[in-house]
Amino acid sequence: LSNKPNAREAIVDTASRLFFTQGYHATGLSQIIKDSDSPKGSLYYYFPHGKEELALTCINKTSEIVVRQLKQYVEKDVAVEKAVQNFILQMVRDAEESDYTGMVPFSFWVAVETSCISEELRKACQAVFMDWQDVILQRLLEEGTDAELAADKASVVVSLFEGALLQTLTCRSTGPLLAAAKMIPGLLG
């Protein structure tokens, strides 16, 4: 077992990066072990159920990061449409600063690829989208939007920023994210 205090974190970070860049099926445990600089025993110690358990951990970590970032914008004292617009504009800056690398829409590998592997992973992916929508939904409800309309708007917004990010990375252009940001006031206002 590794004496490194962050062996588990290194494994999760490496697996997340590889799953995002190569996909679930193309990423092997041996590569994760090698690239994370961790002994094989560490991976099986932290993830005794193997690759699927590791993928589930990566899914949950990704969700937590996005929820935290989204909440930072949505919980500010500005209207929800401005908050979501600012969140998307931050994605624009991130895309430009990273030269369109290291950013992958959640739906790209996780929801599409892993949700077909097992019911547990599918449910985890579903929960991620629901968690993201809930951040927006709660703010819309606080602002007095009808519950059903708020749920629909939150779903559309998550679909919009995921789709815009996918197009941004594919086209290597911030145009789709900028267009999405422009549409937010009409959707949420």
Predicted regions and their residues:
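Amphipathic C-terminal alpha-helical segment
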Residues: 94-98, 116-120, 158-176, 187-189
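Amphipathic alpha-helical packing segments from all-alpha helical-bundle domains
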Residues: 116-142, 152, 182, 186
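Amphipathic alpha-helical segments used for helix-helix packing
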Residues: 58, 82-86, 97-120
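N-terminal intrinsically disordered/low-complexity leader segments
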Residues: 1-6
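Short, basic, alpha-helical segments at the C-terminal edge of helix-turn-helix-like DNA-binding modules
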Residues: 59-65
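Hydrophobic alpha-helical segments that form the core
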Residues: 106-109, 148-167, 179, 183-186
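Hydrophobic alpha-helical connector segments
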Residues: 71-101, 153-157
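Helix-turn-helix
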Residues: 10, 14, 18-57
